[in-house]
A protein has these predicted regions:
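Membrane-proximal basic amphipathic "stem/tether" segments
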Residues: 1-25
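N-terminal/domain-start segments enriched in small and hydrophobic, helix-friendly residues
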Residues: 13-22, 31-35, 88-98
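Canonical Radical SAM [4Fe-4S] cluster-binding loop centered on the CxxxCxxC motif
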Residues: 18-58, 65
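Short, histidine-centered active-site or binding-site loop motifs used for metal coordination
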Residues: 36, 48, 126-130, 194-196, ...
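Residues at alpha-helix caps and immediate loop-helix transition turns in enzyme cores, especially N-
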Residues: 41, 55, 83-84, 174-177, ...
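Radical SAM/AdoMet-radical enzyme domain recognition
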Residues: 59-73, 81-194
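A C-terminal junction/extension of Radical SAM enzymes
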Residues: 195-259
Length: 259
């Protein structure tokens, strides 16, 4: 499972940029939510940006104001917002790496609105799910929805990753089973993040990353976690952040790595 050369280069750059704010005044990874960010930005972008005929059903491409190289789109459920596909396509076309987190429940009816791109990933969210529940149980529904969403997106030519959220008390064996089950779909990668600020949970997640993820996906998981954690947790986390070793960029060459 590999990244594109451009994405690999951007992740290497993250090793130098992660401890400080970018000199241009924007973070390396920016979290956006259609609940709060897209509605207010749409009017301004539509009024100020030229319309470009891209030969598709989408009448224009909006060049975004967001300068961060990686954009993480999340929220209650991004696919419930009608403007998300247009914004996502425009952000990816502008040169940003875009990750759209979704449960996958609405993906079947919205998939045709998105454009495959080497800069765009569907990040299917698996939060505290038992990977092998009783198949006759209702609790299996979210897991099956996520699996089907990954399968649909892959068949349609999109890059995909599974975002596994680790909660306190989660068993390593369960996460490993979930990772193995999803790996059968030949997804492009995995993100592994914790649900809350906890030293014990952090140790557990770091151990799982070393065991299950490549260095690139482990780094991206850490970057995503820095914006996905609750605000209070992020502030405390940044205070105690330790920089990665300068020797680590050498470990980010292209190659087939697990996770």
């Amino acid at each position: 499972m590999t990244f594109s050369l451009r994405f690999t280069a951007d992740l290497i750059f993250a090793l130098a940029a992660r401890a400080i704010t970018n000199k241009n005044g924007f973070p390396f990874i920016l979290q956006l939510s259609p609940d709060t960010d897209f509605d207010t930005g749409a009017a301004a972008l539509s009024a100020s940006m030229p319309r470009v005929d891209n030969g598709s059903s989408q009448s224009s491409t909006l060049v975004p104001r967001y300068r961060s190289p990686i954009l993480w789109i999340s929220g209650s459920e991004p696919l419930d917002h009608p403007e998300v596909p247009r914004f996502t396509n425009a952000l990816a076309a502008s040169g940003r790496h875009v990750f759209l987190q979704t449960s996958g429940a609405s993906l079947k009816r919205r998939l045709h609105e998105f454009q495959p791109s080497s800069r765009f990933y569907f990040a299917i969210h698996f939060d505290g799910l038992d990977p092998l529940p009783d198949r006759s149980s209702a609790c299996d529904a979210p897991f099956r929805v996520g699996i089907e969403a990954l399968r649909m997106a892959r068949l349609a030519g999109f890059f995909t990753c599974a975002h596994l959220v680790v909660r306190p008390g989660a068993e390593d064996s369960k996460l490993e089973e979930l990772h193995a089950e999803i790996s059968k779909l030949d997804v492009d990668g995995f993100l592994l993040t914790r649900s809350a600020l906890s030293p014990e949970l952090e140790r557990n997640v770091n151990r799982l990353r070393r065991r299950l993820l490549s260095r690139r996906w482990a780094l991206l998981s850490d970057l995503v976690e820095s914006v996905a954690l609750p605000a209070a947790s992020r502030n405390s986390r940044q205070t105690g952040r330790q920089p990665l070793s300068e020797s680590q960029p050498d470990n980010f060459e292209e190659g087939a790595e697990a996770g």
